[in-house]
Amino acid sequence: MSRTKDPAKQAEDLREKLRYHEHRYYVLDDPEISDADYDVMMNELKALEAKHPELLTPDSPTQRVGGKPREGFVKVAHSAPMLSLDNAYNEEELRDWARRVEELSGKAEIEYECELKLDGLSMALRYQDARFVLAVTRGDGSIGEDVTLNLRTVKSVPLGVSSATLKKTHMLGDFEVRGEVIFPTKSFEKMNEDREKQGLAKFANPRNAAAGAVRVLEPNITAQRRLDFYAYFLLVDGRVHIDRQSEALDTLEKLGFKVNSNRAVFKSIDDVLKFIHKKEEDREKLPYEIDGVVIKVNSTALWQRLGFTGKAPRWAIAYKYAARAAVTQVEDILVQVGRTGKLTPVAALKPVPIGGTTVSRATLHNMDEIDRLGLLIGDWVQVERGGDVIPKVVKVIDDKDHPRGKKKFKMPERCPECGGHVVRTEGEADHRCVNANCPAKLRESILHFASRGVMNIEGMGDSLVNQLVDRGLVKNVADIYELDEEKLLSLERMGKKSAQNILDEIKGTKKLPLERVIYGLGIRMVGERTAQFLAEHFGSLDGVMKATEEELLEVEEVGPRIAQSIHEFFAEPSNRELVKRLEAAGLQFKGVKKERGTALAGQTFVLTGSLPTYSRDEAKKLIEDAGGKVSGSVSKKTNYVVAGEEAGSKLDKARDLGVAVIDEDALKKLLGK
């Protein structure tokens, strides 16, 4: 017990001691005192702060847990985008990336910093005046959710940094730490054992459990989950200020953050690959889940020179380990109906653990895939799951230990949801329900419209959408904008605050850009990327609606089938009426038209092989920005074939047809670079 008479000094001494021992226990994993001794100090500080409330500080160890349950999460813009990384799945792809880095940077020797890719939830922590003030989830990379109260309960998150430490590390401004919230394997297994004893459903995997724990509305529940936080990125006053990533990680450790010790710096890709393969061998021994290794250019000065692609930095890449697999039995084949009416066969599997997740379903894509596999109900199959990819059936096992099934699957002629006719258009692999009023199509179209990356309407999930459709409150996505408090309060488990939160979320969608609106319409074959290209090319939804198929073909990545799909969608009167109602609701129907150059206007290019400095996507974008068009196949209409290393059959065909073959340097000259 402290004998200091001054309560303020006594409280500060206790806080310093508790922070020190929390760091020893939760960050260094090297405690110096027993839990009982720690509890004595904690209780002494609680009593002192209760007696002298004016002494309570936001970064006190007593303030980790507590607070009333919240109604929802506030959305917060990131100080700088939290971008995803490009992936490499084999040695060749990693070497291609390294070669591009060397060419673009103009450096023959590059230092590569390697870190384990933890399988958790990305998080940004902000510190002002050395105190932890905000935690934001990654969200869509631009906007996340404020989960500060929950992250305060994670013991490896420092609530503050001492002035002495700041001075020692030359941290002169406010700073932001990015990292991964994970569920350590032992804690996860213990929690699932406890849930099983209580008759509760077990969590499928540590990543999902961590994400769920971060997003519960009661911080006390987060505290019970014993999560961990590993830091991997440091921003000071919104910018990178340390010369090397390896030094930034060292600084994070000095600031009191937990940083993964499985990291190293190498000067050759050969050594990087040795590190990658060694860590894959050690994977099962680690106290947490990983799904690969992140490789970064160590020099942060080169980060500026290398820059970014559309969604990822050029100075980093994630080497993803091969999918984990297991053998199990197909108990049945079910059919799901999607928002475009597509019928997708799904294998109902005997539950099997794969990479920390219990898998009981696997997509079979379409009837052609079932025929290719030669799959029968009752067969034993190999199932793979990699990262967030939906589990898939890779092959049928046919040996004496795994007898073949007997029952052949047949695609239904009537929709399992509405009984409508099912058709398969000539030249397509998919079967579709043609009933425009199919409730399954309606449900899926609304879920798509409300999903993250589209309109991002928080709270509009399966349960709410099912009620809205079943009660006839929503018959298309435009009806969402006619919902009011009275309609929402008529639904089960809906209170005033929840109803208001949903209405606020719906109102917020009116500020989202044109490409989100186009993507949200659910036009068949129009994904997020194509929607963005349409918005950039035409600059308004009216321009897209009025475009002919020929005009649509001028848009990047739009081929004949996509052009036909877009044209047919807007030719349908009910869809035009839907668009009219969405415009009346106040959604963004105008964007910024991206003007393209004319240097390569009217020229058609085909890319083949690996180019020295450009990735295929980068070369394609440069050509299209200059007014050219990139095709996937060589024909007499092709003007140039751009050939790199290991060019394939397209090069042979170009020579046969007499099409000009050029290399990357020649392409740069055509581009005026």
From Swiss-Prot:
Family matches, as Pfam families: BRCT, DNA_ligase_aden, DNA_ligase_OB, DNA_ligase_ZBD, HHH_2, HHH_5, Nlig-Ia
Metal-binding recorded as keyword: yes
Catalytic site: 117 (n6-amp-lysine intermediate)
Highest taxon, organism lineage: Bacteria
Requisite cofactors: Mg(2+); Mn(2+)
Domain BRCT: 595-673
Keyword set includes Membrane: no
UniProt EC number: 6.5.1.2
Residues given in the record as NAD(+) binding sites: 35-39, 84-85, 115, 138, 180, 296, 320
MF terms (GO), sorted A to Z: DNA binding; DNA ligase (NAD+) activity; metal ion binding
Record key words, sorted: DNA damage, DNA repair, DNA replication, Ligase, Magnesium, Manganese, Metal-binding, NAD, Zinc
Top enzyme category: ligase
Chain positions recorded as Zn(2+) binding sites: 415, 418, 433, 438
Alphabetical GO biological process terms: DNA repair; DNA replication
CDD domains: BRCT_DNA_ligase_like (cd17748), LIGANc (cd00114)
Catalytic activity of the protein: NAD(+) + (deoxyribonucleotide)n-3'-hydroxyl + 5'-phospho-(deoxyribonucleotide)m = (deoxyribonucleotide)n+m + AMP + beta-nicotinamide D-nucleotide
InterPro entries: BRCT_dom, BRCT_dom_sf, DisA/LigA_HHH, DNA_ligase, DNA_ligase_CS, DNAligase_adenylation, DNAligase_N, Hlx-hairpin-Hlx_DNA-bd_motif
Function: DNA ligase that catalyzes the formation of phosphodiester linkages between 5'-phosphoryl and 3'-hydroxyl groups in double-stranded DNA using NAD as a coenzyme and as the energy source for the reaction. It is essential for DNA replication and repair of damaged DNA.
Family recorded in the similarity comment: Belongs to the NAD-dependent DNA ligase family. LigA subfamily.
Protein name stated in the entry: DNA ligase
UniProt gene name: ligA
